[in-house]
Amino acid sequence: MEKIKVREIFNNAYSVDFGDGLKRIATKSLVPGKRVYGEKLVYSDNIEYRVWNPNKSKLGAAIINGLKKMPIKKGTKVLYLGASAGTTPSHVADIAETSLVYALEFAPRIMREFIDSCNERKNLIPVLGDANRPQDYSNIVEKVDVIFEDVAQPNQAEILVKNAKWFLKENGYAMISIKARSVDVTKNPREIFAEQKKILIEGGFEIVDEVNIEPFEKDHMMMVGIWKGN
């Protein structure tokens, strides 16, 4: 068994040191022995950790790249927009641990993959729906502490504001992975990031952190905001 050093960097999120100088992060396994996307399982003091691959998770990439504000923690209720097959939502569920994570995905085929890989995480609630239409899933999703968005649409920022108005508690947090090329392939990414930030601020957010997630994802920026409403 590999000898590793584990250190908590955020609540329920850890750095793992294999002694090779590489930066790695992990979460405690909510379902020990269960992999979601082929991730490595490691052990320290009889606790199992899932190594979090930043090449497959924009939130993981942001943490590796120096994210300072991490609002997701134990007991945090989360709405995750753009769940895909469940890679990042599974780590978010590990962190939230005792509270619910609503995971929204638009594509039925991908949602089936998500359910197959994450069905043992009892705090992870699959929701099939369109992030542009929060009213359609308002009978399922309760008020949440954090919204995380990873939706590759031209109106990414507007989608976040729309969902915040429906579901985010006052002074709750939102995290959004902005994909510049999904907004406009003709513009400089920095210009797009500035435009998206302006939409978020005008929509009711105070931006408190920004992290570029290259080289893990090209032309992506993670932004963290506090919801002040409007």
Swiss-Prot record:
A molecular function GO annotation: rRNA methyltransferase activity
GO biological process: box C/D sno(s)RNA 3'-end processing; tRNA processing
Keyword field contains Methyltransferase: yes
Top-level taxon: Archaea
InterPro entries noted in UniProt: Fibrillarin, Fibrillarin_CS, SAM-dependent_MTases_sf
Sites where the protein binds S-adenosyl-L-methionine: T87, T88, E105, F106, D130, A131, D150, V151, A152, Q153
Pfam families on file: Fibrillarin (PF01269)
Swiss-Prot/TrEMBL keywords: Methyltransferase, RNA-binding, rRNA processing, Transferase, tRNA processing
Assembly and binders: Interacts with nop5. Component of box C/D small ribonucleoprotein (sRNP) particles that contain rpl7ae, FlpA and nop5, plus a guide RNA.
Stated role: Involved in pre-rRNA and tRNA processing. Utilizes the methyl donor S-adenosyl-L-methionine to catalyze the site-specific 2'-hydroxyl methylation of ribose moieties in rRNA and tRNA. Site specificity is provided by a guide RNA that base pairs with the substrate. Methylation occurs at a characteristic distance from the sequence involved in base pairing with the guide RNA.
Protein's name in the database: Fibrillarin-like rRNA/tRNA 2'-O-methyltransferase
Organism: Methanococcus maripaludis (strain C6 / ATCC BAA-1332)
Taxonomic placement: Archaea, Methanobacteriati, Methanobacteriota, Methanomada group, Methanococci
This protein's encoding gene: flpA
